[in-house]
Design a protein with these regions (language model features):
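ABC family nucleotide-binding domain
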Residues: 3-212
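Conserved beta-strand-loop-alpha-helix hinge in the C-terminal portion
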Residues: 216-234
Length: 234
């Protein structure tokens, strides 16, 4: 069976003057389509480097990365830009919203670069912000801003949603709301969702868990009994 995502012996080395930093070494893992995968590890483990390579925002030093059967590790600049634009949605810890645009306008920006027609207002309603769509980011809570960020990512109808510490700046209750939405997105749409976190408690919600430490993939686990977010405590 072909996996949707395959990392094959991926290494990444950064050079700073005469110093070489090995951010990743011989990383191997797979993710199937429609899974919610949690990549977990301490700060500096290499999680974000993995995410950046998977999202086409960084290149690898050696190895191969396949997404949907295509080797993205050797794409040219134009093809890699198209991959990021059309196939991947991004959600970050800090929401990166444009402050002088309303919530609706922030989401509409994503629809303008998508090759799939979507209704920004409808997507905001799906994440529970129908009555906040005319508000500016400064008028929204942190959780609401993150919901706008997720709506913006979903507006592109990506095959792959990448989330880097999506609850890191949020309180416990709001963080659970965000994680519930991400879990529901994978379950209901068949979208592949990847969450980067240092919080090992979140592994219970995942279909697949990739443990990263010191730039290596220590182990990968499948979880046939993923828990609903509401049943997880930390």
């Amino acid at each position: 069976m072909e996996h949707f995502i395959e990392f094959r012996h991926v290494s990444k080395t950064y050079t700073m003057g005469e110093v070489k930093i090995n951010a990743l070494h011989d990383a191997d893992f797979v993710i199937d389509e429609g899974e919610l995968c949690v990549i977990v590890g301490p700060s500096g483990a290499g999680k974000t480097t993995l995410l950046n390579i998977l999202g086409g925002m960084d290149t690898l030093t050696s190895g191969e990365v396949f997404v949907g059967g295509r080797d993205i590790s050797h794409l040219g600049v134009k093809a890699l830009t198209a991959y990021r634009r059309y196939e991947v949605g991004f959600v970050f810890q800090f929401y990166n919203l444009i402050q002088n645009l309303t919530a609706l306008e922030n989401v509409e920006m994503a629809t303008h670069i998508s090759h799939v027609e979507t209704d920004a207002a409808e997507i905001l309603a799906e994440v529970g912000l129908a009555d906040r769509c005319r508000n500016f980011p400064a008028q929204l809570s942190g959780g609401e801003q993150q919901l706008v960020s997720i709506a913006r990512a979903l507006a592109k109808k990506p095959r792959l949603l990448l989330c880097d510490e999506p609850t890191g700046a949020l309180d416990y209750v709001t963080g659970k709301q965000i994680l519930r939405l991400l879990q529901d997105t994978a379950r209901k749409t068949g979208m592949t969702v990847v969450i980067i976190t240092h919080n090992s408690a979140l592994t219970a919600m995942a279909d697949r868990v990739v443990h990263v430490k010191n730039g290596t993939v220590e182990r990968m686990e499948c979880n046939p009994a993923a828990k609903p977010v509401d049943e997880i405590e930390w």
